[in-house]
C-alpha cells in the first residue's frame, strides 16, 4: 500500500525511474534538506497519533501537540505537559482539555482498559505489551462504527483499502476482538463489486473512490483469508454469523480462480505498490494462493463440497505456477528475473502458507538486498521512488515472517527497529526517512496490524490456511493431468494420475 503518493499521479512515473528522479529534484529543489532545527520533525510527519472514542470518532494529534504529552496507561486519554488531560468525550467531535482528575476522562480511560481486557494483548514482555496495547487502541480508533477501517487518520489516508482492512480484521481476530473484526468484514462484503472484486479504495460510507486508480486484484485473496481467520479463531462467536459473510468470500474466491491464465498465474496489474506490472507479480499471486486455500477450507467446513473442490484445484494450480515461474529465479517481484527482490516474498511464508525452506532462504536474501542504511526496507529492490526512505508495512512483514518461523533473533531485530521509529505517541508511521525520523501519517493501520500479528506469533503459532488434500468426503476422485511434448513431429502425451484435493 503506497499511501505516500496517493492522489499525486506519481504512478505514471513507476516505470520511468529517471523521470521520477527528475520530478523529485524539481519538487525538492537543489538546496538540500532543511537544517535539523528548522522544525521539530525533519520529515513531514502530519499526524503523531490519535485521541478518540472507540464508539464514534477520533481526532488527530499533530507532532507539535504531541510534544511532552503521553497517554494515560492503556487509554486514549492524553496527559499534557502541564498536567491536564485531553480526550474526546463520547459522542463528541471535538477534543477537550480538562483537569487531571476529571471524571469524564477517567471514565474514558477505564472504558478502553476494559475493552483491552476483553481480548488478549500480545507480547513476551512489558515493552511489547505496551506496543500491542497502543496498536490495538489505534486500530480501534481507525475503525468507524460501520466497520470502515481507515488506512490512516489524515487527508489522503482517510479511505478504506481492502488489503489494509483485511489485515486489520485479522489483527482484531488474533487478539480476541471478533466483533470489531466482523464489522470490518461486513463492511468489505457490502462494498464488494458485482464481479466479486473491489475497487482500489473506498470512502468511509462504502462508496468506491473512482479516481482512475487501478484495481488491486490481491483483495480477492486477502478477504477470504480474513474471513477464514475470523471464523476459525472465533469458536461459538462466529458460528452463527459466517453465512452472512460466505457469499462475499465465495465471490472473491470465484474471481481469484477465474483470474488464473493458461500459465496458472493471475495477470499482471497493480500490486500493493499500486503500480502496474506487465508480467504476473508475486504481490498478487501469493495472496490469491492464500485466499483460495482459505476459501477451500472454509467451504469444506461449511459443507459446500463443490466449491471446496474448485478452490482447492485452483489453489493447487496456482501453487504449481508459482513454483514454476517464481521459485527458480528467487521469488522476485514479477516473473521477470530482473524485477528485483520484493517484500511480497513474505506472503509465501507463515502465517500465509506452510513453511518452505526455499521460501525462507529467499526471504533472508530479500532482507539483505533491501535493507537500507537507516535499518528498514523499501517495498522492493527496484522501487522507483526515494531510495533512502524505509516503509514500515514492508519492514513489518519481515518481522511477521521471522516471528511466525520461530526466528526470535530476526523477529526481535525487526520489531526493535519498528518500535524505535514510532512517533512520540507510540504510533507506527507509514515511512521513516534517511535520518530515522517518522514520515507521512501515523498511525498507519496496515503496519499496526502486521506488528500485532508478529507479536501474537511470539505467543504461539498463528493459524495458516491448510494446503488442500484429498479426503474420503470428496469420493477420492482422481484427476488426470495431461501434458504434451512435441517429439519427432508428433505429440507424446504424458498422463499423471493424482488424487484431487
Each model region followed by its residue ranges:
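Long, well-ordered core segments of solenoidal/helical folds
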Residues: 131-147, 177-199, 244-265, 312-330, ...
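The feature captures the catalytic groove of carbohydrate-active enzymes
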Residues: 67, 71-97, 146, 150-159, ...
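Extended ligand-binding clefts on enzyme/binding-domain cores
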Residues: 214-218, 243-244, 279-290, 301-302, ...
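Low-complexity, Ser/Thr/Pro/Gly-enriched N-terminal "stalk/linker" regions
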Residues: 29-158, 182-183, 187, 196-198, ...
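C-terminal capping/lid segments that line or modulate ligand- or cofactor-binding pockets
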Residues: 168, 213-230, 337-357, 394-484
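Aromatic-rich carbohydrate-recognition surfaces in CAZymes
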Residues: 158-260, 285, 428, 441-459
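Structural helix-adjacent loops and short alpha-helical linkers that scaffold large soluble proteins
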Residues: 120-129, 173-185, 230-250, 296-316, ...
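C-terminal membrane-anchoring or membrane-association module
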Residues: 489-501
Amino acid at each position: 500500500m503506497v499511501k505516500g503518493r496517493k492522489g499525486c499521479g506519481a504512478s505514471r512515473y513507476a516505470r520511468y525511474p529517471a523521470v521520477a528522479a527528475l520530478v523529485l529534484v524539481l519538487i525538492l529543489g537543489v538546496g538540500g534538506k532543511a537544517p535539523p532545527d528548522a522544525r521539530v520533525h525533519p520529515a513531514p510527519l502530519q499526524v503523531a497519533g490519535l485521541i478518540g472514542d472507540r464508539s464514534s470518532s477520533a481526532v488527530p494529534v499533530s507532532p507539535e501537540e504531541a510534544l511532552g504529552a503521553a497517554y494515560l496507561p492503556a487509554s486514549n486519554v492524553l496527559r499534557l505537559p502541564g498536567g491536564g488531560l485531553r480526550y474526546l468525550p463520547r459522542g463528541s467531535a471535538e477534543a477537550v482539555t480538562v483537569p487531571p482528575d476529571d471524571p469524564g476522562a477517567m471514565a474514558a480511560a477505564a472504558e478502553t482498559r476494559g475493552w483491552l481486557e476483553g481480548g488478549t494483548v500480545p507480547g513476551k514482555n512489558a515493552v511489547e505489551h505496551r506496543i500491542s496495547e497502543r496498536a490495538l487502541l489505534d486500530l480501534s480508533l481507525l475503525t468507524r462504527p460501520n466497520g470502515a477501517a481507515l488506512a490512516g487518520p489524515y487527508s489522503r489516508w482517510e479511505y478504506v483499502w481492502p488489503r489494509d482492512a483485511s489485515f486489520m480484521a485479522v489483527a482484531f481476530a488474533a487478539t480476541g476482538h471478533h466483533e470489531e473484526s466482523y464489522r470490518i468484514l461486513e463492511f468489505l462484503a457490502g462494498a464488494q463489486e458485482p464481479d466479486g472484486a473491489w475497487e482500489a479504495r473506498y470512502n468511509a460510507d462504502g462508496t468506491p473512490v473512482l479516481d482512475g486508480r487501478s484495481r488491486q486484484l490481491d483483495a480477492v485473496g486477502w478477504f477470504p483469508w480474513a474471513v477464514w481467520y475470523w471464523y476459525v479463531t472465533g469458536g461459538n462467536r462466529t458460528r452463527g454469523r459466517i453465512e452472512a459473510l460466505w457469499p462475499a468470500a465465495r465471490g472473491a474466491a470465484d474471481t481469484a480462480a477465474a483470474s488464473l491464465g493458461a500459465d496458472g498465474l493471475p495477470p499482471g496489474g497493480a500490486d500493493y505498490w499500486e503500480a502496474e506490472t506487465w508480467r504476473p507479480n508475486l504481490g498478487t499471486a501469493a495472496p490469491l494462493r492464500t485466499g483460495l486455500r482459505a476459501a477451500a477450507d472454509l467451504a469444506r467446513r461449511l459443507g459446500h463440497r463443490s466449491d471446496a473442490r474448485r478452490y482447492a484445484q485452483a489453489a493447487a494450480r496456482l501453487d504449481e505456477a508459482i513454483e514454476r515461474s517464481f521459485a527458480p529465479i528467487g521469488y522476485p517481484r514479477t516473473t521477470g528475473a530482473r524485477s528485483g527482490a520484493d517484500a511480497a516474498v513474505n506472503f509465501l511464508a507463515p502465517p500465509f502458507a506452510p513453511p518452505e525452506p526455499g521460501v525462507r532462504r529467499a526471504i533472508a536474501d530479500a532482507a539483505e538486498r533491501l535493507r537500507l542504511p537507516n535499518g528498514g526496507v523499501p517495498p522492493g529492490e527496484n522501487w522507483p521512488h526515494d531510495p533512502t526512505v524505509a516503509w514500515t508495512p514492508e519492514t513489518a512483514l519481515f518481522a511477521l515472517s521471522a516471528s511466525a518461523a520461530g526466528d526470535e533473533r530476526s523477529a526481535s531485530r525487526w520489531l526493535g527497529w519498528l518500535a524505535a521509529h514510532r512517533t512520540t505517541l507510540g504510533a507506527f508511521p507509514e515511512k521513516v526517512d534517511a535520518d530515522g525520523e517518522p514520515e507521512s501519517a501515523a498511525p498507519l493501520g496496515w503496519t499496526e496490524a502486521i506488528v500485532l500479528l508478529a507479536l501474537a506469533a511470539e505467543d504461539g503459532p498463528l493459524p495458516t490456511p491448510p494446503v488442500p488434500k484429498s479426503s474420503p468426503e470428496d469420493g477420492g476422485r482422481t484427476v488426470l493431468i495431461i501434458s504434451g511434448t512435441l517429439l519427432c513431429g508428433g505429440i507424446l502425451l504424458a498422463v499423471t494420475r493424482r488424487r484431487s484435493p
